[in-house]
């Protein structure tokens, strides 16, 4: 709910968005639209190859957050026939102000968090989202359910959000709550590997700091081509390389 008492609702399976006033009257409703995806892995074949396309992919948004009284952001998870692997900022008249395209998923891939087994479905599957202002800077936090990662975006310029950091998450982050007064972000992670002796579903808490990001410690960003990875068996480096 924004400060005008307006609510925006995602009708996910219908790929639609509805804005209601405080009395429940429909102020606006419009399609969430589609995205053309290029340079993705759309095949579950055990190989990280990012040379496929999906045209007019339905956004089918899940979570959303107001950014101000006229703009809101949606996480384009997909549920039935869609999933656009990113996120979008709309104004409440239904105009797209920003579309991430494949840029968020590329960051997930470069950080070694891409879930190849979900390639033929919805890829990194951004589902949850939070918005908060920390020390005067507005941030959108985008949760990659399948990539187990949180993207932190500075949305000071709504037309050009900046990815400032990736936060390693527990398995399958589903929801998030920001507590700016304490400099905290909490995420609820629904993945539960208890039966296999692994981590149970849990909550993670992050603290806001004015310091360089410490994650990821290794990335394939800057390579001539997009390189995905998920494990390392050996590593060597030298100062003069």
Model-derived segments and spans:
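Sequence/structural signature of beta-propeller domains
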Residues: 1-241
């Amino acid at each position: 709910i924004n400060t005008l008492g307006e609510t925006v609702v995602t009708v996910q399976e219908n790929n639609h968005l509805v804005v209601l006033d405080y009395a429940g009257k429909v102020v606006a409703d419009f399609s969430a639209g589609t995205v053309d995806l290029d340079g993705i892995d759309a095949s579950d074949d055990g190989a990280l190859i990012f040379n496929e396309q999906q045209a007019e992919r339905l956004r089918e948004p899940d979570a959303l957050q107001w950014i101000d009284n006229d703009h809101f952001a949606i996480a384009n998870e997909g549920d039935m026939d869609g999933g656009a692997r990113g996120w979008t900022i709309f104004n409440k008249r239904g105009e797209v102000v920003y579309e991430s395209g494949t840029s968020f998923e590329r960051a997930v891939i470069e950080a070694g968090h891409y879930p190849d087994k979900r390639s033929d479905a919805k890829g990194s599957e951004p589902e949850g989202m939070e918005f908060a202002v920390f020390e005067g800077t507005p941030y959108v936090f985008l949760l990659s359910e399948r990539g187990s990662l949180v993207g932190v975006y500075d949305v000071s310029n709504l037309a050009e959000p900046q990815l400032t950091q990736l936060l390693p998450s527990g398995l399958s982050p589903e929801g998030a709550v920001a507590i700016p007064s304490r400099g905290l972000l909490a995420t609820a992670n629904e993945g539960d590997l208890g039966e296999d002796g692994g981590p149970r579903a849990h909550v993670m808490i992050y603290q806001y700091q004015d310091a360089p990001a410490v994650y990821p410690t290794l990335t394939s960003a800057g390579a001539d081509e997009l390189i995905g990875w998920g494990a390392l068996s050996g590593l060597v480096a030298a100062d003069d390389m």
